[in-house]
Curated annotation (Swiss-Prot):
It is found in: Nucleus. Residues 333-344 have a biased composition (Basic residues). Its main location: nucleus. Disulfide bonds: none annotated. NCBIfam families: nfo (TIGR00587). GO terms for biological process: base-excision repair. It comes from Saccharomyces cerevisiae (strain ATCC 204508 / S288c). Pfam families: AP_endonuc_2 (PF01261). It comes from the Eukaryota. This is Apurinic-apyrimidinic endonuclease 1. Binds 3 Zn(2+) ions. Residues 312-367 are annotated as: Disordered. DNA repair enzyme that cleaves apurinic/apyrimidinic (AP) sites and removes 3'-blocking groups present at single strand breaks of damaged DNA. APN1 accounts for > 97% of both apurinic/apyrimidinic (AP) endonuclease and DNA 3'-repair diesterase activities.
Amino acid sequence: MPSTPSFVRSAVSKYKFGAHMSGAGGISNSVTNAFNTGCNSFAMFLKSPRKWVSPQYTQEEIDKFKKNCATYNYNPLTDVLPHGQYFINLANPDREKAEKSYESFMDDLNRCEQLGIGLYNLHPGSTLKGDHQLQLKQLASYLNKAIKETKFVKIVLENMAGTGNLVGSSLVDLKEVIGMIEDKSRIGVCIDTCHTFAAGYDISTTETFNNFWKEFNDVIGFKYLSAVHLNDSKAPLGANRDLHERLGQGYLGIDVFRMIAHSEYLQGIPIVLETPYENDEGYGNEIKLMEWLESKSESELLEDKEYKEKNDTLQKLGAKSRKEQLDKFEVKQKKRAGGTKRKKATAEPSDNDILSQMTKKRKTKKE
């Protein structure tokens, strides 16, 4: 660890702003990387996201992870949100493939409990060509089984962007799965801001932002809200594209992140950046942006010249990308209106997910 971290953690923030960190060279390094980036929470992969089977942790590495958490004041039960592998699909109608997913899923949960981690983020998967309701029941059955086979880790289901037959593109999907879970203290929800917007839930204005969270509370309930993934969206509302953008440069804009930094119901849970950066400096700067937004009242910010300048600058930086995605979206809309057939998407990760971002990081920071 350098004698002085690149970004100093805020000791006064009510919000656990953080980012997805690399665990290259040992899972304990994710803690050090989080500290040096100024994170108050963090995410990481528990093992290689490209392989079904990875070497188990040594006791030395487990002890080092726990020691680092204690040294840098992270509570692994509440501040760490590992991300599950993207190819885990417990809703797969092919039971052989679903069982293979379950083995990798259970390996992740066991790793969490070895490290003392209390939260685990999971993409709910895809029903593919199966019956939607039957596959939701299958997913819930696997989750119930996993909960019985582990001791304390909470499974946090992430909402999705709406492509193909992905589970979790609607809040109702998540409600139905939660309704089938026997021990509800072991299940939660992570709301991804990009996925939410892409799935057709408008959160870009004060009115629609508040309406979404009211709907979330009515359908699911705030008691299940366990984490947030913080991303802007390159694609327009309802595009069903999982395209993460840097904060303020996408269709959400800085106003949404201002509202997040003043939402009481988001206090005390991991709020984790998954924006497209090739190194951790970008994450550190965005954490400081969120803490700056938190430090001023909303009324002050709306009258603040610096706030307006930041908004204008960020929107200009993302203008080209937004225009490209809008053009693609409009072409697809015209094809749909004309009855052109299109292939259904499956639960494969998008080109802009965390895995691809971590791959880019390897070009600048060898893992």
